[in-house]
Amino acid sequence: MSINTTNSETNELLYGIIVPCYNEEKRLPYADFLKFAQAHPEVLLCFVNDGSKDNTLAVLNGLQLESPSNICVYPMPQNGGKAEAVRQGMLYVYQNFNLKLLGFLDADLATKPEEWLQMAEYKLKFPRFGAIVGSRIQRLGADINRDENRSLVSNIIKKCIRILLKASFQDTQCGAKIFQKNLIPFLFSQPFKTPWLFDVEIFLRLQQKFGKTTLQKGVLEFPLMHWTEVGDSRLKLRDTIKIPMQLLKLHYQYNISKKFTTKTGHSLFDAQNNITNLKKSMRQAAAFLF
């Protein structure tokens, strides 16, 4: 286990960035992360090794040794996917470090950690917002490099997500997000229900927290100045095809199933639970009659 909690009781650390890593041995921007860590001792970098099959863990351990005061490594024994890596990393940092804000960032640094820090500092000016999320809005003065060939699919998905959330967010899928510390247990205690759209699921959980009509008063979008799509960070076509079904699944889980839930918390569509309850009722009736 390469977990270091020596700084959990210091007052130097203010922010925590979780960085999920899977097979990043040859891709991790090592020098960029190290430069940022050494320049910003107030920021904790927690790298989550998501059961990598290469030497990612050794690379991360080496990075930690170069800046042990604000770099830690959380090793997952097996690959659980980005959503689970982020979830476990967020809970680990929440439980072991006293920070003001926690969030995550992609290992490829499509969004630079310096801009993540700008988001965090901007968030402190608006304490009424529970979360601040990066938004890759193409506009004058911004350097946002996205694959134009994916724009049609992305726009269709974005419209579907807007319908699901019933809110006019510009970008739910950006890998840079930051949350107030008190929201972490509510957002990350339970595993995510979909592997591809956990960002959307975070918004749905925020919606549960703030309410459908007041979600936009609890979440702040931050237009990024720089964002660059990096190599194979793009969603594969076969995964893109699965997204509509994943959205339907989330719609059912978060919006529909609640309307068909019993007082004991079971869904009316849970056949196995319904059979169990029926058998229990029959036994009780038989005991009463005989």
Report the location of each language-model feature:
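Hydrophobic helical membrane-anchoring modules
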Residues: 1-15, 190-290
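Short beta-strand/loop segment that forms part of the nucleotide-sugar
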Residues: 19, 42-52, 74-76
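Short, well-formed alpha-helical segments that are part of the catalytic scaffolds
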Residues: 23-38
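Acidic helix N-cap motif at the loop->helix transition within catalytic regions
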Residues: 26-30, 54-63
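A conserved acidic beta->alpha catalytic loop
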Residues: 49-58, 109
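Acceptor/aglycone-binding surface of glycosyltransferases and processive sugar-polymer synthases
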Residues: 76-92, 101, 113-192, 196, ...
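Short beta-strand-to-loop acidic/aromatic patch adjacent to the donor-nucleotide binding site
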Residues: 98-110
